[in-house]
Regions:
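Radical SAM/AdoMet-radical enzyme domain recognition
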Residues: 105-123, 132-253
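Short alpha-helical segments and helix-capping/turn motifs at coil-helix boundaries
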Residues: 56-57, 70, 163-164, 232-235, ...
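A short acidic, helix-capping loop that chelates divalent metal ions and anchors anionic groups
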Residues: 94, 185-191, 259-262
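Flexible mid-to-C-terminal extensions adjoining Fe-S/redox cofactors in radical SAM and related proteins
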Residues: 1-40, 353-443
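Conserved alpha-helical substructure of the radical SAM core
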Residues: 12-20, 24, 35-164, 168, ...
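Extracellular structured ligand-interaction cores
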Residues: 70, 324, 438
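Radical SAM enzyme [4Fe-4S]-AdoMet core and its adjacent flexible, acidic
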Residues: 195-199, 211-408, 412
């Protein structure tokens, strides 16, 4: 329901009473995102085949509405830190979970055998995945199995302290370092990580820059209201200043996995729309609230590709309220152009989706390709593009943004492409079953 321009979730439990929580702090952006709600094709060979009610038989199950776009595979629950804020509750379970190399391979094979779309991307997590004894071997095997995008979610200690380990990981096929990054002050890390960590983060960036063919870095800030929301713009500037190796930022508003009273919940709760509003304010309008779109906004591109090529393609049919993102073209920290400034996103995606439905019913695919190109010419304004880009080179960048070719394409242009987004993990206070059914990031 809406209250004072905010979207509030209210629940009533016979045993535990009334619960109220802000899920989005801006109803306008919430309603805009709802326009991009799509049900996906699910999984043809789920682990649970006869589930009756979601989420009682979670698995993946036959009721799930999205295939796996990104898999998170925990290599261990051990960690080389003891953070007060820890999504995985690492080192606190009282036992060690650490699958053998063969077990990890079997899990990866299950993901690659998923139908009708094989899982294209994998992120190794934990605990701290880089302390797994056969980490480099796992990266090599993931590459061998055909994962197009291989990531690791890390605190950065191993990559900061052992350059040869970083080099071996990169040479094995590591594409992206998802680097925990809560701010540019050790005062923040003392609260969030119980130790100074800023020097470690700087060292990771420095070491990655030394590599001949470096993986991309994505900064992953956990945002807690009252702790570090004032760091959003400084972190954004840091990413721009280091855009030769930092290719993205993925903010994660804090999820409350333990007990918390109502006052503390309201005090510390931070939503995706808070992020969009704060970034606009802190950058003085350089990145506006209107530049953000939900993850499934790109579904029409996938459905059109599926219709034209005749085979299912990766489709991000997450719930429209799970994540927000925008793409930026960056020349330097002072020259940034959001993609939305030269692409009319909403009408373009609407017409592409309508075209995909027509293409599904047509045996002749060439007219659909020609129509798609005419739509792109209609809604992409070359006069507003970054200098050095035209429609064709821009389309090549988009088509290769998930692969190594994107770096080669961008190297010919003075502008770099950067992803800025946010994904809000659910907790008991904002749990939404409709989000769960459509989740495309599977553990």
């Amino acid at each position: 329901m809406e209250k004072d321009g905010k979207v509030v979730m209210e629940k009533e439990c016979p045993e535990h009473g009334h619960f109220s929580d802000i899920v989005w702090s801006d109803v306008e952006l919430y309603l805009k995102s709802e326009q991009f709600a799509f049900d996906g094709i699910g999984v043809e060979n789920p682990f649970i085949t006869n589930a009756k009610v979601c989420p009682n038989d979670c698995g993946l199950c036959n009721l799930h509405l999205s295939h796996t776009s990104l898999a998170n595979l925990d290599l261990t629950n051990r960690c080389n830190m003891k953070c007060p804020i820890c999504f995985a509750n690492a080192n606190a379970s009282g036992y060690v979970y650490e699958p053998s190399f063969d077990e990890v391979v079997k899990m990866m094979q299950v993901l690659r055998n998923s139908k009708p779309v094989a899982c294209p991307a994998i992120q190794f997590a934990g605990g701290e995945p880089t302390i797994y004894p056969q980490f480099v071997d796992v990266i090599k095997k993931a590459k061998e199995l055909g994962f197009a995008q291989i990531q690791v979610a890390t605190n950065g200690l191993m990559f900061a302290n052992d350059f040869e380990f970083l080099k071996a990981s990169a040479e094995a096929g590591l594409n992206t370092i998802y680097l925990q990054f809560d701010g540019l002050s050790d005062d923040i890390y003392m609260v969030s990580r119980a130790r100074k960590m800023l020097e470690v983060k700087m060292k990771v960036v420095e070491n990655v820059r030394k590599l001949n063919n470096p993986p991309s870095i994505v900064l992953v800030p956990v945002i807690v209201k009252g702790l570090n929301e004032d760091q959003i713009e400084p972190m954004f500037r840091f990413a721009l200043e280091n855009s030769d190796v930092i290719r993205g930022m993925n903010f994660q508003p804090v999820a409350f996995t333990g007990r918390i009273n109502k006052d503390e919940l309201a005090k510390q709760r931070y939503t995706l729309t808070d992020l969009a509003i704060d970034l606009e304010a802190q950058t003085k309008g350089q990145i506006k609230k209107e530049d953000w779109f939900p993850v499934p906004s790109v579904v029409p591109i996938s459905t059109l590709a599926t219709a034209i090529l005749g085979e299912p393609k990766v489709t991000f049919t997450t719930h429209p309220h799970c994540g927000l993102a925008t793409y930026l073209f960056v020349q330097d920290k002072d020259h940034v152009i959001p993609l939305t400034h030269f692409v009319d996103v909403e009408p373009l995606f609407k017409e592409l989706f309508e075209l995909s439905k027509k293409a599904e019913c047509s045996k002749l695919k060439l007219p659909s390709k020609m129509k798609a190109y005419s739509l792109l010419k209609k809604y992409i304004h070359e006069d507003k593009m970054p200098e050095g880009l035209d429609t064709m080179s821009f389309l090549k960048l988009l088509s290769s943004v998930m692969g190594d070719e994107s770096k080669q394409s961008l190297s010919k242009c003075s502008w770099k492409m950067m992803f800025v987004g946010g994904m809000h993990f659910q907790d008991l206070y904002n749990y939404d079953i409709e989000r769960v059914k459509r989740c495309a990031i599977h553990y």
